[in-house]
Amino acid sequence: MTLSLEQLSSRMRRGEDIPLRETAQVVLALSIPSILQQMVVTAMEYIDAAMVGHIGAEATAAIGIVSSSTWLLHGILVGLYTAFSIQIAQYLGADRQADARGVLRQAMLFNLILGLAAAGFGIGISRFLPGWLGADLSLQANASAYFAIWSAALPFTMAMGMYAAMLRATGDALTPGLISVLVCGLDVVFNFFLINPTRTLPLFGTRVTVWGAGLGVPGAALGTALSNVIGGLLALAILLLRDGPLCIRKPGSWKITRACLLNLWRVGAPLAAERAALSSAQVVLVRIVSGLGTVAIAANSLGVSAEGLCYMAGYGIQDAAIALIGQAVGANRKDMAKRFAWLCTGIGIGIMALSGMRLWVFAPALMGIFTADAAVIALGARVLRIEAFAEPMFGASIVASGAMQGAGDSTACFVLNLVSMWGIRLTLASFFAPRFGLAGVWGSMCCELCIRGLLFLFRLARGKWLEKGALA
């Protein structure tokens, strides 16, 4: 029988030597649901891209031009709320359940305040953003509408991600996965009716008229927004009704504490800065790609979606690594934290190496899912095959950074990502894009990801990441 994370944490606090087999079972028990959740999230991106892609390359390009900006805004929020889940994991590892519940209450207030502020900011800049990014005039109206609608749902999108991370910190990776499955299913349904106009479809040998709003690109944004609203409300309801260490109904203060703010600053600020550095680099990269034409913009956007099939496993294992290592550090078991870190990283490298092989083989078929445009398929398949070589080291950087974050070493993650993205990827891309087009951009990306993976492995091997801690 597989140990629960709560049982494992109790044994770690007692100083027991836990066999490698049991350790591996816990890693897999947390990783598999998280990987499945990432698969569902990626599937939702595929659905949006495929449904819009069949409208035409311009519709795909309209979403692609603002996609990096959605990553930037959402990424900053993710970086900040991840700091709350790291604190909760470490408090639970130290058996300080009341403190963990206090962090949860403060996180709820944070979600309300910052989520609304981010939504207002996104809506406010949506009119001007495509122009700032160099989009063609024919793309700007749809791109602006997509970003505004997506931004409006940010408080709920943030709630869904934040509360899912907190559930994983307690060892429950299944519930967030089930919420994601529901959200993906709703996204399919909403997109089906909102993107396309009213039309006649075959059904059991006859033809039926199916209503559609015919909104196109804004319909895709509205479908995603509505499904995220439902997912966020559901995640909140589960936390409010749940018993266990994070039972919010138990007596406790809603006051924002100095200790929580200090922990948020020490861990969350570097994480948010890291996400901002990565995502803003993607914005610059989109700016570089936007000068290569509509086909390149569409191929780049769809290629990023297709590549998600590979790295979703890495991010699923990263989620598990944050929870496991956070609890090990909280229990003052650095030996177990090291074991979890290398075990998770090794699994991540192996799975993403296999995913890279699949990406190489099925690149044209993957692009064909999203669009019928032959030029976009050909260019997208070419750059995906370039990127396939980087997947193992990309996996190393993703999972190793999760291990370091779980221990509170978020500043090093920020520095390594900043140097890698801005010092290597953008420098190479700006040089090679005019000479080799989109292939030059993705070749630069491949080179940078390999170097980034090696940097994170070196940091992990040195062991200094265990000296930080996340609790004030």
Regions found by a protein language model. Name each.
Residues 18-50, 54-55, 68-87, 112-119, ...:
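N-terminal transmembrane alpha-helices
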Residues 29-48, 149, 160, 227-231, ...:
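Transmembrane helical elements of multi-pass membrane transporters/channels
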